[in-house]
Amino acid sequence: MEKFIVVLTEKAKQDNSLHKRSGNKAIERKIKSFLEELKVHPFSRTGQPEALKYELHGFWSRRINQKDRMIYSVNNEIVTVEVVSAMGHYFDK
């Protein structure tokens, strides 16, 4: 019963690749779980979903681990969730 199509930006794909290369299977499973959840529940469930404020207004985040967040936006008109980042804390370098 998927409602949304999940699309990863190039940055999110690179971040996901870095997580895979780290060898941390728990993080890999968590990211995979988040991507599946986003198809149905982009605003609730695991990872403490949070609407972001200020310059990131319109984006949401989910906690991957203490250091990393999955950042995404939801477009209800075209039923799409765009994941823009999966590494770092709100675009910190």
Per-segment meaning from a language model:
Residues 1-5, 13-29, 62-93:
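Enriched for short, Lys/Arg-rich terminal
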Residues 5-6, 45:
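Residues that recognize and position ribonucleotide moieties
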Residues 9:
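Residue-level signal for threonine
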Residues 28-36:
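PIN-domain endoribonuclease scaffold, especially VapC-family toxins
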Residues 36-62:
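A short, surface-exposed loop/turn module that caps and links secondary-structure elements
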